């Protein structure tokens, strides 16, 4: 069973926390992590790209010159794909790129990402994180005490004060435990979680 150090907001170690093997101690499956990241990026795509075919380009209704007798090549429209300014053949059109991996694969990918952070020592657990009001300066102080400047900050539930305090700090992203995804975990150097967030992750993804 993996254990991690438990810190207070002053950056001092106040104990250790045992993590569940089935969440934070699984074998890291890199191909599954790759699949999960590709899925996440595909699902973020808007898919609004578009090109006009010869029937959609403005103009080109009249035959540019008669079929025979001019000595020039025969053409029926100035919007043929052969012409500059003409339509596009087989160009991109709006489409939906989103898809979903099987639930078991998604869960395995998330557990692999969390386990990878534990293995590399890039997970920090806070005993408690409470702010009376949104205060970016106070959040920056806490992160500085932890020697963190690029991290995913995970809370157990939606915490307006923490979210508003952290969202203006560069390279820091606040997120709720139930909304964790593989891409965010891997995209940031450190994973900073509250003790309650760890319990919530173990409850939701067990």
Curated annotation (Swiss-Prot):
Family in the record: Belongs to the universal ribosomal protein uL4 family.
Molecular function per GO: rRNA binding; structural constituent of ribosome
Pfam families reported for this sequence: Ribosomal_L4
Function comment: One of the primary rRNA binding proteins, this protein initially binds near the 5'-end of the 23S rRNA. It is important during the early stages of 50S assembly. It makes multiple contacts with different domains of the 23S rRNA in the assembled 50S subunit and ribosome. Forms part of the polypeptide exit tunnel.
Subunit organization: Part of the 50S ribosomal subunit.
Biased composition, class Basic residues, residue ranges: 60-77
Signal sequence, start to end: none
A single cellular component GO annotation: ribosome
Membrane-spanning ranges: none
Keywords in alphabetical order: Ribonucleoprotein, Ribosomal protein, RNA-binding, rRNA-binding
Name of the protein this chain belongs to: Large ribosomal subunit protein uL4
Region Disordered, residue ranges: 48-77
Gene Ontology biological process terms, A to Z: translation
InterPro entries noted in UniProt: Ribosomal_uL4, Ribosomal_uL4-like, Ribosomal_uL4_dom_sf
Basic and acidic residues compositional bias, start-end: 48-59
Disulfide bonds: none
